Amino acid sequence: MDLNKSHISRIIHANNITLKMTRIRHEPVKRFGKDIDINNNLKEFYDEIKKYKIEDIICIDETSVKSLQKRNHCYSEKGKRCVIKTQSQEVFKKYTGIFAISIDGVVGWDLYEKSGINADRMVEFLETHITNKFRNKLIILDNASSHRNPKVKELITKYNHLLYAVPYQHFTNSIENYFSMLKSRLQKLDGLTHSELKRNITNTIKQIPKEKYRNIIKGAYERPEKYVSKKNKTRKIKKNYL
């Protein structure tokens, strides 16, 4: 039997098989030499989340921010490459940003010109934006070493509650989705220096609607127990080609 590519494509399409972006999810069975069960860890994580109102959740994390924020794809005339020419050495710089979000928006942020987040900077950030302002909130952090420092734990748990995201499961800290939204908007703005980037971040935060924060946190922490597939109007009745 001789099948051409077009016919194979029709068979695949008629059987509701579509090309999707590949997602790699790391689910190891050991961590630091000890057995771990990712699924059990996820269950315990969400069981703990259910004890709190969504209004009482604050997610904190740091992210690397490039000085040159530009889209990976852009429009250009046929036959011509899309090239952005730069002269300043500022384009090679990266900065470390730390943010805290709730359903009400960004409750605190900072952008460090040099070095990353260590325990001392984490404590300073918490004292400035979180622990002196909030009580009985659930603070969600990832498993970075600076987040697990005893001083950080003690400061948070004095008046609030602390929950660590599940290792290797970045979606358990909803702020990761916020970073994607923030950076996609920064790509549309000009500015290379540290001060220009801080100005752009300030303006971008003001422009992000409040409901976006609620959607991000609800999407991460009010997940259904079991995924229910929505009715798809484009789904076809499978054909038997044999």
Residue ranges and their predicted role:
Residues 25-33, 107-120, 135-138:
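Surface-exposed cleft-lining segments at the edges of enzyme active sites
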Residues 39-128, 228-237:
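Extended, low-complexity cationic-aromatic segments
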Residues 5-7, 11, 54-55, 175-242:
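C-terminal anion-handling pockets and recognition modules
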Residues 1-30, 56, 63-67:
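Conserved short alpha-helical interface segments
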Residues 149-159:
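Short, aromatic/basic amphipathic alpha-helical patches
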Residues 61, 135-148, 173:
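Acidic/histidine-rich, metal-coordinating catalytic segments
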